[in-house]
Amino acid sequence: LECHNQQSSQPPTTKSCPGDTNCYNKRWRDHRGTIIERGCGCPTVKPGINLKCCTTDRCNN
């Protein structure tokens, strides 16, 4: 599986995720605005954080 791993509005980058079946896109707001984190897997998140997990290559941009 290949997942995007750039932060927020950085240019797209990807990484290979051997053994993982999900990519995630996690977003929340703080004093800097909306923060977006992307990566491999499907993490547990705290309330108030918007999480999307998906299962195809580069699906989490």
From Swiss-Prot:
Location of the protein in the cell: Secreted
Cysteines engaged in disulfide bonds, as pairs: C3-C23, C17-C40, C42-C53, C54-C59
Database matches in Pfam families: Toxin_cobra-type (PF21947)
This protein's UniProt keywords: Acetylcholine receptor inhibiting toxin, Disulfide bond, Ion channel impairing toxin, Neurotoxin, Postsynaptic neurotoxin, Secreted, Toxin
GO cellular component: a single term: extracellular region
Superkingdom field: Eukaryota
Residues spanning the membrane: none
Coiled-coil regions listed in the entry: none
Segments of skewed composition (Polar residues): 1-16
Molecular function per GO: acetylcholine receptor inhibitor activity; ion channel regulator activity; toxin activity
Protein name as it appears in the record: Short neurotoxin 1
Source organism of this protein record: Hemachatus haemachatus (Rinkhals)
